[in-house]
Regions:
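N-terminal catalytic scaffold of extracellular/periplasmic and nuclease hydrolases
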Residues: 22-185, 189-191, 198-216, 316-381
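Metal-dependent active-site segment of extracytoplasmic phospho-/sulfohydrolases and closely related
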Residues: 62, 288-329
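Gly-rich Lys/Arg/Thr-decorated short loops/hinges at beta-loop-alpha junctions or inter-strand turns
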Residues: 109-114, 226-236, 272-277, 349-351
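Functional beta-strand-loop-alpha-helix junction segments that form "active/interaction loops"
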Residues: 120, 210-248
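Short amphipathic alpha-helices and their capping/turn segments at secondary-structure boundaries
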Residues: 130-134, 215-218, 248-258
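Active-site His/acidic residue clusters
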Residues: 151-157, 231-236, 240, 248-251, ...
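Acidic-aromatic/histidine active-site loop/patch
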Residues: 185-189, 193-196, 200, 221, ...
Length: 381
């Protein structure tokens, strides 16, 4: 009897130590010292969609959003969304997805395998929202803060079974038909192993290739533009300022000249990086930079009246948990449960005509399907 009691005591002690080790994860604290004002944006009354702007926070979950809300003293531009939903992100061969598979589902409406970009599980190229827009006579563009050979921008313009085949992916851009591109990663466009000079190929296709910010922001003609001012990623948020917002608005300005409309994908790319690094301060700065870009885009969409804005994520990164904080001080205390992606559902927010079609719980492929219907018909019947 005493042996059984001793065994029970030891077992309970082991369980207690295990539980403590499991839940006593190290926390990080961040206080946002540059809080910004947020305005209430009145949603347009129109019902017909002419343009769609899809904004992807790479690795962004509900916890990222609420932590950023707390850091900015209890307000975000994102709160102007008039509809919210939840998206399931699984890949065909793996529950926890990546930006290749998750982004491809958003871009093409097809579930695919882990690491695949713009192709189905058998490697067959898929039709993306860029292709849909072009077939409708609309313009199409992308603006990102990552390298243009990263998965998310490639999901919309390129095709490969393996996202790590970066030079092959970049080689697909000249044939993509995309009208406006802004991002980093110039080093994969020239000096390549295959001898191709992708910048020259783009010029032959009629693109203006911009290698500096001054040239990019001064550009004011109707021909296509491919802007790659950085060899790798764009700079950190403290260094680049509101570059994502400015680049996005430049794309909107240029593509809005097409009377038939446009589709644009904008990505807050580096949220994912700092989720992987478990670096709370930089993660929050990236999330808040993305939110300020959302604000600029939503304000423009409200004035335009025919533009739907959809904000979502391809997956969650870092297993972020907000464990404490103070929204009056802008202080957040968080922990991370992984340095990789998690399998959490991700939020979907919508603003503008057609927003009501993005409520509920659904597959990430449904985001594509609903956007395609709205781009094609202006409404969902």
């Amino acid at each position: 009897m005493k042996i059984n009691r001793l065994f029970a005591i030891v077992a309970l002690a082991v369980c207690a130590v295990t539980a403590s080790a499991q839940y006593n994860m190290p926390t990080q604290t961040f206080t946002y010292d540059k809080p910004y004002a947020v305005e209430k944006i009145k949603a347009p009354k129109g019902k017909k969609v002419k343009n769609v702007i899809l904004m992807i926070g790479d690795g962004m979950s509900l916890m990222h959003v609420y932590t950023a809300w707390t850091a900015n003293r209890g307000k975000l531009w994102l709160e102007n969304a008039t509809a919210t939903g939840l998206s399931k992100t699984w890949a065909t061969n793996k529950l926890v997805t990546d930006s290749g598979s998750g982004g491809t589902s958003l871009a093409t409406g097809v579930k695919t395998c882990y690491h695949a970009v713009g192709v189905d599980p058998e490697g067959k190229p898929l039709t993306s929202l860029v292709d849909v827009a072009k077939e409708l006579g609309k313009d199409a563009g992308i603006a990102v803060t990552c390298r243009l050979w990263d998965a998310t921008p490639c999901d919309f313009c390129c095709h490969n079974i393996d996202r790590d085949k970066e030079e092959e992916l970049v080689g697909d851009y000249p044939a993509s038909g995309v009208n406006f591109v802004f991002g980093g990663g110039a080093e994969k466009f020239f000096g390549r192993k295959d001898g191709r000079d992708i910048f020259n190929e783009l010029r032959v296709k009629g693109y203006h290739v911009s290698r500096s910010l001054d040239d990019f922001f001064a550009y004011d003609t109707n021909s296509n533009i491919f802007a790659v001012p950085y060899d790798k990623d764009t700079p950190l948020p403290d260094e680049r300022g509101d570059l994502l917002a400015r680049a996005s608005m430049k794309g909107i300005e240029l593509m809005n000249r097409n009377k038939k409309g446009f589709f644009m994908m904008i990505e807050g790319s580096q949220l994912d990086d700092y989720g992987h690094f478990n670096q709370l301060d930089m993660l929050m700065k990236e999330t808040l930079d993305f939110d300020q870009t959302i604000g600029k885009v939503m304000k423009w969409a409200a004035e335009d009246g025919e533009t739907l804005v959809v904000v979502t994520a391809d997956h969650e990164t870092g297993g972020l948990t907000l464990v404490n904080g103070d929204k009056n001080e802008g202080r957040v205390e968080c922990c991370f449960s992984t340095r990789d992606h998690s399998g959490a559902m991700v939020p979907v927010y919508a603003f503008g005509p057609g927003a009501e079609h993005f409520t509920g719980i659904y597959e990430n492929t449904d985001v594509f399907k609903r956007i395609k219907q709205l781009l094609t018909n202006g409404v969902i019947k």
